[in-house]
Amino acid sequence: GENTFYGRVIHEAIHEFVNKVKSGARGLGPEKRIKLLLGPVGSGKSDFDRQIRRYYEDYTRRDEGRMYTFRWTNLCDVIPDQDPADDVVRSPMNQDPVVLLPQEQRDSVIEDINEILEAPYTIRNEQALDPASEFYMDKLLAHYDDDLQSVLENHIEIVRLLADENKRQAIETFEPKDKKNQDETELTGDVNYSKIAIYGESDPRAFDYSGAFCNANRGIFSGEELLKLQREFLYDFLHATQEQTIKPKNNPRIDIDQVIVGRTNMPEYRDKKGDEKMEAFNDRTKRIDFPYVLSYENEALIYRKMLRNADLPDIQVEPHTLEMAGLFGVLTRIEEPDQSSIDLVQKAKAYNGEIDESDDVDVKKLREEAATKVEIGEGMTGVSPRFIGDEIAEAIMDSMHRSRSFLSPLTTFNHLENNLENHGSIPEDMFETYYRYLELVREEYKERAIEDVRHALAYDLDEIQRQGEKYMDHVMAYIDDDTVEDEITGREQEPDEQFLRSVEEKLELPEDRKDDFRQEVANWVSRRAREGETFDPQDNDRLRRALERKLWEDKKHNINFSALV
């Protein structure tokens, strides 16, 4: 769908975030921490954060996600100086109605609720009423001689609470209005000057609970570019996380209950991490890494999604165009391997899942090796999908301008190459390296294009099937130290080593690796036989490619290329 995230590393990040929220719901500690989404620009942090908020909005509109709050009513009937405009007052912090009960009664009610719900976590609530609600409760209890039931029956209405970012209700996205002059009232609320003349400055009714933490109560606080805030301003987050309280101006501490999410990029993270004065803040954050995609086919899916959502006329994207653009992106994000037996492109292919049983490539070891070289992990640096997506868009417009109805890999490569140095986020000292990576991608594309031509010209299903069966007959005889029947004479003979090697050499398998490959395909055939499936070389990518290349070598001298042109 349109809200899909691509790539193993991104799904690991999402899984980690969900686990932290779940453990927080069980009171295991993460509820007292900021969930800090850390990643390079364009890695999907903001999109993920936005989708969390949209999901929460949707969830509170469903039966299983129902939330309730309360409002005070008929206040002017009891409180003489109550402003008629404030006869009905909604809970300014959208608190749960259960906080209206004294703790002993509340605990009994919550115990009954937990038994009925049979939820995988236990509901708890030890919060105090916010100052304004506490004021109303005290006044009303005094009027009714401490009869709480009369207060609840005559002055409380229970209302549904729907999370709504546009209304700043149970969801708040925070970005300071002025990054040079940040005011804590943006977080915790401020005096309502229009009410001071009515109630007086120290009256809790004259306070405006419109701070970001107030609006986010019972929901999600999302801090945009959180670590760009001034150090002093971030101190407000210390109590908001560890103690789950806020301290507005001229007010006592107020209890809050919300998931606090922050987003930041690498430069700000390094700056704050190295600041000794930020030690307390850093201790209250749980970092969740949001790196770039490291599988080039998953990267290509991002570009396909972009094109699918664009207002474009029918334009044919040639084979390998988006995959090779994705490969370039991945090459800029991964570390050069230490193994002499594997190069950077092969490592990218391994990360893409293009390895076989006989390949001497340990993907887990490659990841661990890279982790020792970089500060956090692979994918935290490199070219962003935004840059590549922009260049694909430019290449499309260039093709349309030239009256071409297709987008080719070569046009895309040219746009990437011509605009590398114009992109502000790419360090100058990486230009030459990235140009080299583009050349590697061009070579990879050339090999794939040649392979496509071979496949098209040598494509003969019957012959590939026949050659595949012959290869497997000789392989099984080789493994079992047996003989095979000669196709012409019918006599038993030794396996044809020359024929076997003529197939295997098309995959550039050295002599010392042939046994591994033969055992691999033999295991594959045996596994399919047990599952009741017939042998078809088309279902084994490496065997198919080897047979196609051999067939190409056998037939290419008989192809009339002039006639094809």
Language-model features, listed with the residues they occupy:
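Conserved ASCE/P-loop NTPase catalytic core
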Residues: 1-565
